[in-house]
């Protein structure tokens, strides 16, 4: 045991590191060890109420504080009419904060914002400090960064990727305003026996929308029957990208950490 937590939060149990954990149930079991400790030591768990499996995993914990979009101690929702790439959050119940204008890209960051507010209030942080911290935070290190380059807007989300985060990123990207959308996606690692199936599912998801260009990078796509542009190596994708001279495009760059997809922008 490396820590003896009094409070704990599991953001989600997505399809990440399936190879090491032996599947989704293994992921839940591994992450659930945090809740096991809290349950046995009268700890407090923060639960995102929208994910029913987290509520199930937290049963028996004596102190539970919930956040989410419905029926939670702290309620909030994304303001969808904002017309901006950035996430705006309206808080409906639980605090006196009304609205938070973040510099985060993607509605998939809503649970993270609500979790931060919920934890801050639990530990007595002033509303003004919570708002300032969230509104002034600018993502870095290839984590949902919004970059403006040569009249293009680039979402660099290349820190890591798994089927769950890829789905969230692509669906959010599809709903963003913009007519010239370019997908540049690297492979998803550590999926074990599920790798082929999950990459096939990703291609099916891509095909649900119209894109200006789709570029897939890595060996994981080599056996898939796709009509998209494919490169084995990031350096080849970078050379292709340089030759396109895109203007006024909206570009999503995402892939697992080992793919180093940020190099396509060098």
Model regions and ranges:
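Short amphipathic alpha-helix with an adjacent loop that forms part of the alpha/beta core around
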Residues: 1, 237-247
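Acidic, Mg2+-coordinating active-site environments of NTP-dependent enzymes
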Residues: 5-153, 178-179, 204-207, 211-213, ...
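Short beta-strands and strand-loop turn motifs
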Residues: 9-14, 48, 182-188, 217-218, ...
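Glycine/threonine-rich flexible loop motifs
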Residues: 19-25, 166, 192-196, 262-263
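Short, well-ordered alpha-helical microsegments
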Residues: 54-55, 238, 261-262
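Short acidic-hydrophobic, aromatic-tinged amphipathic segments that line or gate anion-handling sites
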Residues: 228-240
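Peripheral docking tails and interdomain loops at the edges
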Residues: 230-233, 248-266
């Amino acid at each position: 045991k490396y820590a003896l937590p009094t409070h704990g939060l599991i953001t989600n149990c997505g399809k990440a590191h399936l190879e090491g954990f032996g599947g989704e149930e293994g992921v839940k079991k591994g992450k659930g060890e945090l809740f096991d400790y809290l349950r046995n030591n009268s700890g407090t768990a923060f639960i995102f109420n929208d994910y029913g499996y987290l509520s199930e995993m937290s049963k028996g914990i004596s102190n539970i504080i919930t956040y989410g979009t419905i029926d939670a101690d702290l309620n909030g929702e994304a303001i969808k009419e904002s017309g901006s790439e950035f996430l705006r959050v309206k808080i409906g119940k639980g605090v006196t904060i009304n609205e938070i204008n973040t510099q985060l890209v993607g509605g998939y960051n809503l649970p993270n914002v609500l979790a931060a507010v919920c934890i801050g209030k639990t530990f007595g942080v002033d509303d003004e400090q919570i708002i300032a911290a969230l509104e002034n935070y600018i993502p870095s290190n290839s984590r949902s960064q919004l970059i403006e380059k040569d009249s293009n807007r680039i979402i660099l989300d290349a820190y890591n990727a798994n089927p769950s985060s890829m789905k969230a990123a692509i669906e959010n990207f599809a709903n963003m305003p913009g007519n010239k959308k370019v997908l540049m996606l690297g492979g998803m690692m550590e999926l074990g026996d599920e790798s082929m199936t999950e990459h096939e599912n990703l291609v099916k998801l891509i095909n649900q929308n119209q894109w200006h260009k789709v570029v897939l990078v890595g060996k994981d796509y080599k056996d898939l029957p796709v009509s998209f542009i494919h490169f084995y190596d990031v350096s080849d994708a970078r050379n292709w990208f340089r030759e396109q001279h895109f203007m006024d495009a909206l570009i999503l760059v995402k892939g697992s950490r080992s793919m180093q997809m940020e190099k396509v922008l060098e």
